[in-house]
C-alpha cells in the first residue's frame, strides 16, 4: 500500500490497519522461527508498511 493511499484514510481506519499488520508481522516471525516462511523478505515489507501507517497517523493527528 502506498503512502498516498494511507493519507486519505481516517485515524480509526489506520489504527485498524496497523493492528492487522502487527498481527501479520507476528505470524510471519513465528513462521520464520519454525522454518515455514518461504520468503523472509516479507517481514521487511510488512515492517515498512507499519512504519508508513505510523507516519500517516502522526501526520493526521498533527493536522498536516
From Swiss-Prot:
Presence of the UniProt keyword Cell membrane in the record: no
GO biological process: translation
SUPFAM superfamilies the UniProt entry points to: Ribosomal protein L29 (L29p)
Keywords for this protein: Ribonucleoprotein, Ribosomal protein
Gene Ontology cellular-component terms listed: ribonucleoprotein complex; ribosome
InterPro entries in UniProt: Ribosomal_uL29, Ribosomal_uL29_CS, Ribosomal_uL29_sf
Protein name per its UniProtKB record: Large ribosomal subunit protein uL29
HAMAP family named in the record: Ribosomal_uL29
GO molecular function: structural constituent of ribosome
One Pfam family recorded for the sequence: Ribosomal_L29
Recorded family membership: Belongs to the universal ribosomal protein uL29 family.
Amino acid at each position: 500500500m502506498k503512502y498516498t493511499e494511507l493519507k486519505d484514510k481516517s485515524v480509526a481506519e489506520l489504527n485498524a490497519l496497523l493492528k492487522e499488520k502487527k498481527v501479520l508481522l507476528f505470524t510471519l516471525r513465528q513462521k520464520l522461527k519454525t522454518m515455514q516462511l518461504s520468503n523472509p523478505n516479507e517481514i521487511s515489507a510488512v515492517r515498512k508498511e507499519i512504519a508508513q501507517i505510523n507516519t500517516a497517523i502522526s501526520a493526521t493527528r498533527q493536522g498536516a
